[in-house]
Amino acid sequence: MRNFSLSYVEKYAPSRQQIKTYLLKKYLKQSISSVKKQNIIDLIDVVLSDLEKTKFISDKFYSDSKAKNLIQRGTSINKIRNYLISKGIQDRYIKETINKINENNEDQDFFSAIKICKKKRIGPSRTEVNRPLFYKKDISLLARNGFDFETSKKVMDLKKDDYLKIINLL
């Protein structure tokens, strides 16, 4: 079991919960009649605690690295929070990561929304003629990406010149 978990860690750099799910699926598929399910779960917990002691897995590191990666892609803070929750990261690590993001950049959502606009070619990156036609559609796209209404409106109301200046800074 330790070998399976080490190969999985080497390949994917997962969170604790992801390894636990992987090992449960792997060993419950085999359905060995002589071994009870509770024994498998206990063994998995022992392997996971051993991996944490040897620093092969760390939910804090996972949380920080995934958040950094998602920010570079232009993901909102709400979406990052929900992603980390879905991966089984503890609340304290999520709060630390979000606080670290806010310390580094006060208005991170604004810059992430700008990145989304550039990538999807919406909002201020559209031609001036088409912007009013697609306003609602663009606002809803930003909302689906986890941005609040104020941030979306602030980005959508940017002038083309200001938008280009910000893009050059990013």
Predicted feature locations:
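An alpha-helical, amphipathic repeat domain used for nucleic-acid recognition
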Residues: 1-170
